[in-house]
Amino acid sequence: MDAQAIERLLDELAARVDTRFEGVQGDYRALIVVNPTDAPYTGVAVLHVDMPLKAGSEPRPAAVWTPDGVRIPCQILHSRLEPVAEWRMPDGSVRPLPDGSRRWRFDLAFWVDGLPPRCYRVYRSAWSADELPLPTLPATEPPVRVREAIPHPGELGKEGGFG
């Protein structure tokens, strides 16, 4: 699969997969991981994050859980902050931000175990008090791709195949 086909697949999965986690309270996000290769994958997956950080807020650790609710190793890597006065929204509009806001860019790296070839799996992420260190850090961009999604109902389950 080429990069554009993977992006289209991630868009489709983000719209169709049930990204809710039963019994989980609080603010969390779903992480849809796609293995577009012909081999099973065990290793690090990386979500590249670019988000506004409110004035007075500080970066904090994150945690990631499997679809079965097992917490897995996860670390924030390559964290960088810069002042920002406005933010471009997904629809292309620009929203002014309060004084003191910052842009936070980082890589959310987490461990994926045994993701079958040409399959996807949904993980849950949330802010945390601590991180579980990864057994190894990625030296190159992993072959799997990750898309963040807000929790919503969908007709597809937490893991499945494609193509």
Which positions does each model-derived feature cover?
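Carbohydrate-active enzymes and regulators
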Residues: M1-G163
